[in-house]
Amino acid sequence: MSSLSAPPGGCGGDVAAAPATATSTATATATATATATATGSMEPAMVPRTANLLACKQWWRVCFLYGDQQKYYRQLYSKAAAQRLAGANQENDNAARGAGAGEGEGQEYDTVAMGDGDFIAAQLDAGEDVDDGIDLGDSSQPGGGATPTATATAGRPLFPLSSSPRRSKKLLRSLRAHVKGESRPEKPAKAAKPQSEPSSELTKRNARVTVLDDPFLFGIDADHLGDLVRGKQYSPLEATENIAKFYELQLETTEATAQVLEIIEQEEEPPEPPKPALPPKQKQPRPVPPLPARITQPAVLQPLTAGDLQFLNLSLRHRSLPRSMKPFKDPHDISFTFNELDTSTSATAAAAAAAVAAADVATGVGVGSSQQESNEPISRTPLTQISYLQKIPTLPRHFSPSGCPQGLPPPPALAGCGSALGLPSSSSASALYAAQNGGMLPTSPLPLQRHQQYLPPHHQQLPPLGAGPGQGQGHGLALGPGGAGLPQYSPAVSGCSSTAKYSNAQLPPHHHQLSPALSTPSPPSLLHHPAAGTSASAHAPFLAGPHMDMQRQSHSDDDSGCALEEYTWVPPGLRPDQVRLYFSQIPDDKVPYVNSPGEQYRVRQLLHQLPPHDNEVRYCHSLTDEERKELRLFSTQRKRDALGRGNVRQLMSARPCDGCDELISTGDIAVFATRLGPNASWHPACFTCCICRELLVDLIYFHRDGRMYCGRHHAETLKPRCSACDEIILADECTEAEGRAWHMNHFACHECDKQLGGQRYIMREGKPYCLHCFDAMFAEYCDYCGEAIGVDQGQMSHDGQHWHATDECFSCNTCRCSLLGRAFLPRRGAIYCSIACSKGEPPTPSDSSGTGMYTTPTPPTQRVRPQTRITSSHASSSPPMSPQQQQQHQASFNQAMYQLQTQQLEAAGGPVSQSQSYATSDSDAGVVKDLEHCRSGDHAGGGDFTDFSGGRASSTSHNMSPLNSPGDFQPHLMPKPMELQRDGVYNFNEMSSNLDTAWPAKPPLGATHSYQLQRQLMENQHTSSMPELAGKGPMLQHQMAAHFGQQPALHSSAQQFQHEYADIMHPPPPPPERGAVGEVPELPTPNLSVASTALPPELMGSPTHSAGDRSLNTPLSAHSATHGPTHPVSILSGASSSSPMSGEPAKKKGVRFEGIPDTLPRSRSYSGNGAGTSGGGDKDRDRDRERDRDRDRDKGGDKDRESGRHGPGHSSRRRRRRKSTSSTSSGNHHRSGSGHRSHSTTRADTYAPAQPLSSSYQGPPSVLQADSETAHKSPRQQREREREESAEESDVCSTCSSSSSSSEDYMMMYQLPQRRHYGGVRVSYVPNDALAYDRKRKPAEMAGDKDKNCIIS
């Protein structure tokens, strides 16, 4: 269009030439960019459209062929490009001169082709010298006022590599200026007239050039190109008019330079044709006469040369070349369609293989040929028609580039604003033009995406546009003022261009010039850049609003650019509005918008669904001659017999979808596949491969037996595909394994390539591995010995941990007894055979010997290994330490504990020190640390541990270890438990005696009241279960009360500790009430830890804990005292261990060792813990009921155990184990029942059988609840929960219970299913965890008691 000529001010022409020539025009553009830019900008806009159309076709071909796209394009266009470049160089030179002169050369800008070779070079040079966006501004300058703006714009290189769009625009403008040099508008008013003339002349020339495949490379459809071409047709005249108008506007805003006037004058002649050109946007190349000239030249679609391709590569981001700007097809006629004939030609030129596939696809092939023909595909309503003015109302929907006017699906194009944003629409010329217009994108038709790349997110363009003027250049820039516009169009440069064009509409004259040449109009847009520079703000606002709307509402039938430029591919033969309707029925993430995930998806699917090696021998490896022939035959036959391409049409009448059987409504878009029948139709989203259910890329399908396949899966229905090389297996022999096939020599280790034929291998993720590589890459390491577990070795796995399936590795961490085929208790990263072992009290050291054992604490070293497994209470929450670390840790812990215990024994009355020693008695150094924390906490009056800032936090964290948890109540008791643990077995009677002895010493610690409450509870419980302790209970309670009295928080922590310890089965730290016990050095800490749970304090634990709470709160104490007996009794029963300690078997709940019932009830009671504390009675009862049910399940075992527990005859060892288990379970239950009391209860319950727990839990819960309620329930509950959590970790047995952080979790964990999940069921000697889980689950359901109880005795 004469828009280039319009900016002939030397610059205009030069600019146009500059892109192509890369000569002084670029420099001139830099210098006189303002003037030339306007023109140049206008011209390039046209080219991109045509180019885009061609590019779309070529793109399709390339994609279909699966060949190297660039290579394919080079093949297709190298020759044409060379010719075009030669012609373009000449024309560009002329155009540049004409542009500089401001003469009619502008009219010849249409011979964008001239710029192809030189044009590209010029674009590059121009980009280097001056930003094209700026140049565009210059082009506007010739219009008049544009010069200042252009100059400002020129400040930044229009086509720098970073902002290639501008350079592209320059090139287009220069080319157009060449072609249209004559038609360049002398004046804005005159320009309107000349536009038509220059448009027609130059449009023809440029149309040929536009046919160049930049747009095609961009993936722009032929339709878009056609629209561009049409735009060119119109652009000379209309461009001139538009330019003239634009210039007028700019002149109004800025001075009109002599060059501008000259340009306008030159364009004045063509302006008459331009008017028709604008209408052609409607589908008529009104500047047809000029366009024909242009078309004639464009008709020669020369393949791009390597140089062209290089330039294109650079230009891909600078799509400003006016390729195929021929107005062959009316913009309306030009719809993104691929002509099969064209296809074949193009396909052949591009890549034979690709062409074949394209040909089969038919439509795809058409794309390439269309480009070659370029007349039709490229032809498009000139951008001038599209002139942004349309947005403005000036341009008719012809404004193909924008396509918005036509109400095309260009709304994305409206993203034209986006183009201002610098959003490129790689497939649509309008996008290119928009970018060019915006001065953002290069003129080259390369995908706007790439332009964007150069101009980061379209914004590079925008930044210049950001400046009012810059925006003005490409009304995408103009959008700058209407910022909204840019963002909206950011999706597609085409939209941007449309927007820019529409912005130009503001400058109707100028814009029209630029606009008419989508080839040229875009340049007008560029011109508008400069002009807009002056009036950018005006344009931008206009552009932002109306333009955006125009693009969105593009009404031009032929202007697929507006609607289509935002897509990298569109179904052939559709109008923009139909294209939008089509894509509206496809998932957004699969719509191939430019630079979107949908575009990436399409590219991936092209390669996946149409594998190049299925069609072309050159893509295959190691084929024999026979196989090569067979592949050719195979490919040819497939294409002949099965290949087809869907035809998209708008239904005139409703019909059912062959995919989903639902009705496709009248007026909806449907896809037809003629190979499957003339009436076979699908929803766009239902047109998928029957195997992979993915959308058939570019509607290319293969049919067989009435079903549609993608290329890949159709080939696999005929021949096997090698899983290694992904090629079709044409050989007579192949290896098949696990439903897959391999070439004989391809079935090898995925890692070392060792042939696996006839050898053992392991499949992982569909890839075979030799045993050696598999072990090296995927073998798990044994948690015990640290050695890799080979594929030939048995492996036990649980919760991310792995062991050799040997007696040595998969064994109890404490007593080292084999756990193969047995239930085990996972805790703190280690596995145990029982709760006692998990607490560091080896059950093996005769429980009956408990007294002696606990009396003489085992040396730390003795307990080191078990404790090693059981990390400190902290360890319970933390991953298990390595055995050595654990041993070391435990050794230090034991030593510390031993010392603490000794100190405690010496200073039995010293609650704090005792508490400390007890804390250490937990299990390992971690516990010792916890104890230390407890000590400091206790001394401070806070919890034993830091966690018990209130005497509870640390306890909670340490609760994990039996001692530490109880240590909360101050490790006083903990040292004993430590000793108990060391002894591993102790006489509960002795323990009770010791406790009694110790308790009296402890009274100093506790408040008498709390102690009494505890004592009463203990006495009641103890009386029933542990008379000994009952007697001494008061002292312990006093001590505890004193201790608690010292620190209510401490009481909480103590209670927490007690509960935890009870849970841990390391009663070592009874509750803080036990602090007294802690004082009692007599009770061996280890035993205490075992019996601690059962200790009166522990029993008091429920009571005691309650007592501790009571000591904290007298009401609680009273309440505990009131309910204490019941709960304590339950606890005592539950604290069978305590009972054993007291020597009484009276605990009906005594030692319920049933893992399942106890565990489940425990978990329930534990979960109900907090609740129990607050409403414990009901919750406890419910939990008790659940326990009862569980018990009923496990009744046999439980009752037996319970009777044993109840029976005084139980050996302390048995009792202790049971107590440990049951105490843990019952303790957990109680804890779940009530927060604080649950701690003491936890211990007592731990010893008590599940049923007793239920009873005790129910009974005590009320008491405990009352206590906890009386005393701050929430704090207690929280503390108890914390303790319980730690205790859970310590106490929980995979079979008996799970160690979860909350009482509810405990309950849940204790439930059969949960325990199974936790590993509560014994891990069977099965390589598959799932099998083991199932086995565990069945026994749990059947006789969960046995399985879940980690049967210890």
Curated annotation (Swiss-Prot):
* Polar residues composition bias: residue spans: 952-962, 1111-1120
Q: Which residues form the PET domain?
A: 548-656
Subcellular location, principal? membrane
Q: Which domain of life is it from?
A: Eukaryota
In its keyword annotation, does this UniProt entry include Cell membrane? Answer: yes
Q: What biological processes does GO assign it?
A: anterior/posterior axis specification; establishment of planar polarity; establishment of tissue polarity
Q: Gene3D superfamilies given for it?
A: Cysteine Rich Protein
Spell out the residue ranges making up region: Disordered: 130-206, 266-292, 500-540, 840-892, 933-962, 1062-1303
State the UniProt keywords alphabetically.
Cell membrane, Developmental protein, LIM domain, Membrane, Metal-binding, Repeat, Zinc
State the annotated membrane topology for this chain. Peripheral membrane protein
Composition-biased stretches (Basic and acidic residues) = 179-189, 1177-1205, 1269-1284
User: Entry's Pfam families?
Assistant: LIM, PET
InterPro entries, per database record: LIM1_prickle (IPR033725), LIM2_prickle (IPR033726), LIM3_prickle (IPR033727), PET_domain (IPR010442), PET_prickle (IPR033723), Pk/Esn/Tes (IPR047120), Znf_LIM (IPR001781)
Biased composition range(s): Low complexity = 147-165, 514-532, 861-892, 1130-1142
LIM zinc-binding domain sequence ranges: 655-719, 720-780, 781-843
Q: Where is the composition biased (Basic residues)?
A: 166-178, 1207-1220, 1228-1240
Q: Which GO terms describe its cellular component?
A: plasma membrane
Record's subcellular location:
Cell membrane
Q: Name one GO molecular function term.
A: zinc ion binding
Task: Tell me the function of this protein.
Answer: Acts in a planar cell polarity (PCP) complex; polarization along the apical/basal axis of epithelial cells. PCP signaling in the wing disk requires the receptor fz and the cytoplasmic proteins dsh and pk. These act in a feedback loop leading to activation of the jnk cascade and subsequent polarized arrangement of hairs and bristles. Dgo and pk compete with one another for dsh binding, thereby modulating fz dsh activity and ensuring tight control over fz PCP signaling. Vang, stan and pk function together to regulate the establishment of tissue polarity in the adult eye.
Q: What family is this?
A: Belongs to the prickle / espinas / testin family.
Q: How does it assemble?
A: Interacts with dsh; PET and LIM domains interact with dsh DEP domain, in wing cells. Interacts with Vang in photoreceptor cells.
Q: What is this protein called?
A: Protein prickle
